[in-house]
UniProtKB/Swiss-Prot annotation:
The chain crosses the membrane at residues 25-45, 69-90, 105-125, 170-190, 218-238, 280-300, 312-332, 339-358. Its cofactor is heme b. It comes from Epicrates cenchria. Belongs to the cytochrome b family. Heme b b562 binds at H75, H174. Heme b b566 binds at H89, H188. Component of the ubiquinol-cytochrome c reductase complex (complex III or cytochrome b-c1 complex) that is part of the mitochondrial respiratory chain. The b-c1 complex mediates electron transfer from ubiquinol to cytochrome c. Contributes to the generation of a proton gradient across the mitochondrial membrane that is then used for ATP synthesis. This is Cytochrome b. InterPro entries: Cyt_b/b6_C, Cyt_b/b6_C_sf, Cyt_b/b6_N, Cytb/b6-like_sf, Cytochrome_b, Cytochrome_b_C_euk/bac, Cytochrome_b_N_euk/bac, Di-haem_cyt_TM. The lineage of its organism: Eukaryota, Metazoa, Chordata, Craniata, Vertebrata. It comes from the Eukaryota.
Length: 370
C-alpha cells in the first residue's frame, strides 16, 4: 500500500498548465547524474590512482575491459551533456525569474559549484598531458590567497609539487563529491516543491494546475529519449569531439603544452581568469564568475518576474548569452591581440549583465509607472 500512495502522490503532483520544454532540463539533469554515477562506478573498478599507471589503466579500460570503451565514452561525453543541460537550466532560471524562489536558487548555485569541482577533479584522473597542466595551473591559483594560500596548495597537492599524492586525493574527491551532489539535489527538489515551479508568464501558478502524470511525465520521457539518443550518437560516431589532442599523450612535467586550457565547459570562467593580467585579480574574477549567481535573487527590483514582458532585459539577456559564447571562444585562443582585448571586453559585459539587472528593473518600473 505505501508504494501505491507514493505513486498516487507523484501522479497528483500539481504543476502549472503552461510550463514549456525549458522546464524539462531538471529531470534530464537527474538522468545525467544517475548515468554518471553508474558509469563512474564501473570505471573506478578498473582505474588505478597512480601517476605511473593511471594513463595505462585508461588504455586498459578502453582496449581490454568488455564495453570499457562504452563506459569511458559515456562518462566523458555524459559530463559534457550534464553541463549543456545545467547551463540551459540556469539560463531558464534567469530568463523566467525562477531565482525569486531564493532557497531553491541558492541550493542550485551551490550544486553548480560542487559539480564544477567534481568535473575538474575527474579531468585530472586520466593523467594526460592537458590533465596534468590544467591541474597545475588551476590549483596554483590557490597560492594567490593571502596568508593561507601556500598552506592550502601544499595540502591539496600532498607535497610541494603535483605528484602521486595529488592524484590519490583527486580520485578520492572525485569519488566522494557525487554523493554530496545527490544529497544536495534531493534538497534542491524538496525546496522547489515547497512552493512549486514558476511558469513562463511569471504569474501565480495556483490559479490553474494539472496533475504531473501523465501530462508532464510523457514530455519528460520524450526529452530524455532525445538526450540519450544524442549522447549515444556522439559516443558512437564522434567519441573524441570534446577531447583535447594533448590529452592523448601521457603527462610530462618537463614539456609544457603550447596552449593550456581546461574542458570546454570551464572555458568561460577560464577566459575571465585570463582576461585579468594579475594573479589575485584573475583568481577573484574566476570565483566571482560563478558566485555572482548567488546575488541575483537579492538584486531583482522589477515588479515583473519573467523577462517575457521585459524587452529591455530580454536584450540584456541575449547579449549576456552571446557574451558567454564569445568568452568560451576566446579562451581557446592564444594569449595575444586581438583575443586578449575581445576577452577583456566580453568579461566586462558578462559582469555588466548582473550589475545592470537592478538598474533595468528600476527603470522599467519608472517607465510603466507601476
Amino acid at each position: 500500500m505505501p508504494h501505491q500512495q507514493l505513486l498516487m502522490l507523484f501522479g497528483l503532483l500539481p504543476v502549472a498548465t503552461n510550463i514549456s520544454t525549458w522546464w524539462n532540463f531538471g529531470s534530464m539533469l537527474l538522468a545525467c547524474s544517475a548515468l554518471q554515477v553508474l558509469t563512474g562506478f564501473f570505471l573506478a573498478v578498473h582505474y588505478t590512482a597512480n601517476i605511473n599507471l593511471a594513463f595505462s589503466s585508461i588504455i586498459h579500460i578502453t582496449r581490454d575491459v568488455p564495453y570499457g570503451w562504452l563506459m569511458q565514452n559515456i562518462h566523458a561525453i555524459g559530463a559534457s551533456m550534464f553541463f549543456i543541460c545545467i547551463y540551459i537550466h540556469i539560463a531558464r532560471g534567469l530568463y523566467y525569474g525562477s531565482y525569486l524562489n531564493k532557497e531553491t536558487w541558492l541550493s542550485g548555485t551551490t550544486l553548480l559549484i560542487m559539480l564544477m569541482a567534481t568535473a575538474f577533479f575527474g579531468y585530472v584522473l586520466p593523467w594526460g598531458q592537458m590533465s596534468f597542466w590544467a591541474a597545475t595551473v588551476i590549483t596554483n591559483l590557490l597560492t594567490a590567497i593571502p596568508y593561507l594560500g601556500t598552506t592550502m596548495t601544499t595540502c591539496l597537492w600532498g607535497g610541494f609539487a603535483i605528484n602521486d599524492p595529488t592524484l590519490t586525493r583527486f580520485f578520492a574527491l572525485h569519488f566522494i563529491l557525487p554523493f554530496g551532489i545527490i544529497s544536495l539535489s534531493s534538497l534542491h527538489v524538496l525546496l522547489l516543491h515547497e512552493v512549486g515551479s514558476s511558469n513562463p508568464l511569471g504569474t501565480n501558478s495556483d490559479i490553474e494546475k494539472i496533475p504531473f502524470h501523465p501530462y508532464h511525465t510523457y514530455k519528460d520521457f520524450f526529452m530524455l529519449a532525445a538526450m540519450i539518443t544524442t549522447l549515444m550518437l556522439i559516443v558512437s560516431f564522434f567519441p573524441d569531439i570534446f577531447n583535447d589532442p594533448d590529452n592523448f599523450s601521457k603527462a610530462n612535467p618537463l614539456v609544457t603544452p603550447q596552449h593550456i586550457k581546461p574542458e570546454w565547459y570551464f572555458l568561460f570562467a577560464y577566459g575571465i581568469l585570463r582576461s585579468i593580467p594579475n594573479k589575485l585579480g584573475g583568481a577573484l574574477a574566476l570565483a566571482l564568475s560563478i558566485a555572482i549567481l548567488l546575488t541575483v535573487p537579492f538584486t531583482h527590483t522589477s515588479n515583473l518576474r519573467s523577462m517575457m514582458f521585459r524587452p529591455l532585459m530580454q536584450l540584456m539577456f541575449w547579449t549576456f548569452a552571446a557574451t558567454f559564447l564569445v568568452i568560451t571562444w576566446t579562451a581557446t585562443k592564444p594569449v595575444e591581440p586581438p583575443f586578449t582585448t575581445i576577452s577583456q571586453v566580453a568579461a566586462s559585459m558578462y559582469f555588466l549583465f548582473f550589475i545592470s539587472n537592478p538598474i533595468m528593473g528600476w527603470m522599467e518600473n519608472k517607465i510603466t509607472x507601476t
